[in-house]
C-alpha cells in the first residue's frame, strides 16, 4: 500500500510551489518547473485531473515532495 493519497493536479502543483518550485514556462497544460539544485521538471496535468498514488510517488522521487506537503 502506498503512503500517497490520490490528489487533484491543482493541489499537487500548489504543494510543489510551496516547497520552492517555480513555474519557468508553460505551454498549454505542460508547465516546466524549476528549483535550485534540482533538474527541471515538466508537470503535464490539467488542474482538475486526479493523480493516483503511484504517479504521485514518481513525481515525489523527482521533486522532493512528501505526503506531508500535500
Regions found by a protein language model. Give the residues of each.
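Basic nucleic-acid-binding interfaces
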Residues: 1-70
Amino acid at each position: 500500500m502506498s503512503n500517497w493519497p490520490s490528489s487533484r493536479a491543482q493541489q499537487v502543483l500548489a504543494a510543489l510551489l510551496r516547497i520552492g518550485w517555480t513555474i519557468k514556462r508553460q505551454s498549454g497544460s505542460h508547465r516546466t518547473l524549476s528549483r535550485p539544485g534540482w533538474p527541471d521538471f515538466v508537470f503535464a496535468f490539467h488542474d482538475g485531473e486526479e493523480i493516483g498514488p503511484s504517479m504521485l510517488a514518481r513525481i515525489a522521487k523527482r521533486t522532493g515532495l512528501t505526503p506531508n506537503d500535500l
